[in-house]
Amino acid sequence: YSPKHIAPGVEEGLATQVDVAPTVLGLLGLPYEAPFFGQDALHTPPERRVAFFSHNHDVALLRDGRLAILGLHKSVEAAAFDPVSAGYGPAPREPELESLAIAYYQTAYELFRAGRYVLPGKGATRVAASR
């Protein structure tokens, strides 16, 4: 909290805990390279914002109110998210969103497995960068 340096405000768009570090670094105006999968919630266009979820054996990606849910044995489901009720309902599957979800989770897995999900420096893979 530093109102002399950063004006207080409210962001109504999609953001989760993985977006905190990139957003704070963006507010501070610091150039950065990081392996974060989160995004600067104040400088990422709404149509590019995503949220990651996991529950039991499923993982999911939310974008534009649509959820791609990846389960065991390559199962895929779709859902629609209503931000007013914070509820979910049935939705048609969206191959592009499913591919994006697979890409995010597969990239994270491959980086971690190969020991390349590390802070910037020798051998690091940059996932996100400053604007």
Feature names for model-found ranges:
Residues 4-131:
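Membrane-interface soluble catalytic domains
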